[in-house]
């Protein structure tokens, strides 16, 4: 990280705590990279017919979950054994919430891979191009959130929230289109699956926004 999370701890006497926290922050960045890869693979499955990717996503998800549990356990250990001061509590609680957001994005990516397998039974829908654009925007939000994390950007929340507005607009527009088509006589399943896709993407974007806002909180101590 350009500026280490552990540097938010100002007491120079607690070198052990700082070293342990550096290990945690490296795990957080590794987890973030795995979630980015999982999200990218779900896009390939949905829009490029790369149907081998759902199995790869499932393998990534195992490592994501392992890191999530490990980071939570480390943070919980700090909270119970290190007698953290108020600034420590802010940092540790933000990290625990942040990795929870990453874990949820990973879960949604795995779900998208499974939905992609089901959609192969149907011809491509005209809405898929717009859904792909929505997916790219959500991925960009995650990328930006993780960049902000490495740089400890105090403006992270504001930057990514503006990007989230684009995803929300796309969701509203696509949902109305799909809801109308659901009422037309014909095959309903692909419409419902695409509605689930855009809902997952909207939630993934929300979690990316949460990550950015938690970065701002770590740096400034102010909630957005």
Curated annotation (Swiss-Prot):
InterPro entries: P_transport_PhoU, PhoU-like_sf, PhoU_dom
Recorded GO CC terms: cytoplasm
Superkingdom of this protein's organism: Bacteria
Record keywords: Cytoplasm, Phosphate transport, Transport
Subcellular localization, as worded in the UniProt entry: Cytoplasm
Subcellular location, principal: cytoplasm
GO molecular function: protein homodimerization activity
Any GO BP: negative regulation of phosphate metabolic process
Pfam families: PhoU (PF01895)
Keyword Ubl conjugation among record annotations: no
Function description: Plays a role in the regulation of phosphate uptake.
SUBUNIT field: Homodimer.
Protein family membership: Belongs to the PhoU family.
Protein name: Phosphate-specific transport system accessory protein PhoU homolog
């Amino acid at each position: 990280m350009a500026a280490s999370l552990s540097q938010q701890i100002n007491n120079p006497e607690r070198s052990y705590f700082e070293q342990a926290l550096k290990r945690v922050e490296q795990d957080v960045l590794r987890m973030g990279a795995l979630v980015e890869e999982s999200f990218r693979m779900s896009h390939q499955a949905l829009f490029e017919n790369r149907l081998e990717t759902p199995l790869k996503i499932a393998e990534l998800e195992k490592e994501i979950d392992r890191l999530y549990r490990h980071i939570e356990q480390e943070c919980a250990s700090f909270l119970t054994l290190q007698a953290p001061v108020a600034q420590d509590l802010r940092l540790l609680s933000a990290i625990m919430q942040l990795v929870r957001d990453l874990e949820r994005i990973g879960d949604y990516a795995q779900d998208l891979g499974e939905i992609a397998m089901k959609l192969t039974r149907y011809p491509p829908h005209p809405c898929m191009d717009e859904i792909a654009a929505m997916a790219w925007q959500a991925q960009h939000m995650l990328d930006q959130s993780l960049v902000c994390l490495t740089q400890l950007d105090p403006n992270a929340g504001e930057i990514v929230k503006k990007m989230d507005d684009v995803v929300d607009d796309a969701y509203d527009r696509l949902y109305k289109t799909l809801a109308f088509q659901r009422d037309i006589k014909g095959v309903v399943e692909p419409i419902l699956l695409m509605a689930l896709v855009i809902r997952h993407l909207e939630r993934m974007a929300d979690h990316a926004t949460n990550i950015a806002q938690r970065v701002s909180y770590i740096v400034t101590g102010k909630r957005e």
